[in-house]
UniProtKB/Swiss-Prot annotation:
Mg(2+) binds at S165, E207. One of its GO terms (biological process) is regulation of carbohydrate metabolic process. The Walker A ATP-binding motif also binds Pi and PPi. It comes from Leptospira interrogans serogroup Icterohaemorrhagiae serovar Lai (strain 56601). Catalyzes the ATP- as well as the pyrophosphate-dependent phosphorylation of a specific serine residue in HPr, a phosphocarrier protein of the phosphoenolpyruvate-dependent sugar phosphotransferase system (PTS). HprK/P also catalyzes the pyrophosphate-producing, inorganic phosphate-dependent dephosphorylation (phosphorolysis) of seryl-phosphorylated HPr (P-Ser-HPr). Homohexamer. Residues 269-274 are annotated as: Important for the catalytic mechanism of dephosphorylation. GO terms for molecular function: ATP binding; magnesium ion binding; phosphorelay sensor kinase activity; protein serine/threonine kinase activity; protein serine/threonine/tyrosine kinase activity. This is HPr kinase/phosphorylase. One of its GO terms (cellular component) is cytosol. Both phosphorylation and phosphorolysis are carried out by the same active site and suggest a common mechanism for both reactions.
Length: 321
């Protein structure tokens, strides 16, 4: 698992929706941002720096700007001395409000990128929080194929040559959608959600032995692919081994841990004659039912227990007399 960071320059140059413009501190554009949370200094500007989150991006909204621009030069100098006494990665003023000259001077001297945006504070925080959540999410790479089947994101795993790509190709031909083939990039966006995607280089492509590299979007159309998908089920394809037990009732609920998240796991034996694509389709539909609270295996088990209990009572009519 990796915990990536992001440079201030990435925010400035790669996210036009933020509307950022650099005013000072260009030499600090390589500063790393390692936290998705942001901070509005607010009370800290009055001199209360207890628990000041200096390692976060500092956002100056209308309130902060109104406060510092209403101070006397002496007060503002004191505010700047205290505020810039902390190690800061970058400062952003929203609503297009220009920071006072003393802020620009300190940022230029200390190498702290100082930027402004015409976007409102609320909208800006919403935008940048989403960007940071996606960019800083814990991530890992996993060998397999990620495909959307009936709206369920399924990660097909298994040894090389077991038939993952061929199974996925058959599913795509049936109208389902490819997300990633061979290497799946997985990110944890929350405590219980994993998103799978593909690298830009491999996006929309598959490798099929005997055919080579295929562009799925060109062959099957734009509706056959998507860029990312929530991972809700792992189907592990295994070669059939005599004597090995596989779940035959569905009462077991095995899971596999990915980035600290437990994902439902199904092990499917592969042998000549088995229609794996239709098994995957059925597993997807069954997973949708389970999300709605319906579990066929448990319902059948309850009916069977009631049937056996009823039969036992009928065979022993004097037991309750």
């Amino acid at each position: 698992m990796s915990m990536p960071g992001i440079n201030v320059s990435n925010l400035l140059n790669e996210h036009e929706e933020l509307g950022l413009r650099l005013l000072a501190g260009q030499k600090g554009l390589t500063n790393r941002i390692n936290m998705s949370e942001i901070n509005r200094p607010g009370l800290s500007l009055t001199g209360f720096y207890e628990s000041f989150a200096h390692d976060r991006i500092q956002i100056f909204g209308k309130g902060e700007w109104a406060y510092i621009t209403s101070r006397t030069p002496e007060d503002l100098e004191k505010i700047a001395a205290e505020f810039f006494g902390f190690h800061l990665n970058c400062i952003i003023f929203t609503h297009g409000n220009m920071p006072p000259p003393i802020f620009m001077e300190n940022c230029e001297k200390l190498g702290i990128p100082l930027m402004i945006s015409e976007v409102s504070t609320h909208k800006f925080i919403t935008l940048i929080s989403g960007i940071l959540d996606r960019s800083l999410a814990p991530r890992t790479m996993r060998h397999g194929v990620l495909i959307e089947v009936f709206g369920i994101g399924i990660l097909l795993s298994g040894k090389s040559g077991v038939g993952k790509s061929e199974t996925a190709l058959e599913l795509i031909e049936r109208g389902h959608r490819l997300v990633a083939d061979d290497m799946v990039e997985i990110r944890r966006l929350s405590e219980s959600y994993l998103i799978g995607t593909c690298s830009d280089l491999l996006r929309h492509h598959m490798e099929i032995r005997g055919l080579g590299i295929l562009n799925i979007k060109d062959i099957f159309g734009i509706g056959s692919v998507r860029d990312h998908k929530l991972i809700e089920l792992i189907i592990h394809l295994e070669e059939w081994t005599e004597g090995k037990d596989f779940d035959r009732t569905g009462l077991e609920n095995p899971t596999e841990e990915l980035l600290g998240v437990q994902i439902p796991l199904i092990r499917v034996p592969v042998r000549p004659g088995r229609n794996i694509p239709i098994i995957v389709e059925t597993a997807a539909m069954n997973q949708r039912l389970r999300k709605l609270g319906k579990n066929a295996a448990q319902e059948f088990n309850q009916k069977l227990s009631q049937y056996l209990q009823q039969g036992k009572v009928e065979r022993n009519p004097t037991q309750n007399q």
